[in-house]
Amino acid sequence: MVTEWKNFFKGCCMQLLNVGFGNTVMVGRVVAVVNTGSSPARKIREIAKKNGKLIDVTEGRRTRSMLVMDSNHVVLSSVQSDTISQRLQAMRIDLQLGECREQGKKVYNENE
């Protein structure tokens, strides 16, 4: 079973984003970070709840942001949407730098 997971993630950079209280989501699967104050956000929340795709990680606190995932799941978080956006941006920059480093290693190894 472990080998299957290793093969599944082989070549894939799995970065996790903290969405509060020790809960994480995969960075590559986040489609949107939505502020909960708008009417469309409430509609998204209702639809996700109706379809059984709503994940609440607020632990009873006020919902401050919603993460829409590529699987149509909606994650409710008590962390501000601006904070989550900043964390996402920082992680994506790190990922791009890592890819540049990997490409540099490949070029360096080919020249040897």
Swiss-Prot record:
<dbReference type="InterPro" id="IPR007169">
    <property type="entry name" value="RemA-like"/>
</dbReference>
<dbReference type="Pfam" id="PF04025">
    <property type="entry name" value="RemA-like"/>
</dbReference>
<comment type="similarity">
    <text>Belongs to the RemA family.</text>
</comment>
<protein>
    <recommendedName>
        <fullName>Putative regulatory protein DP2861</fullName>
    </recommendedName>
</protein>
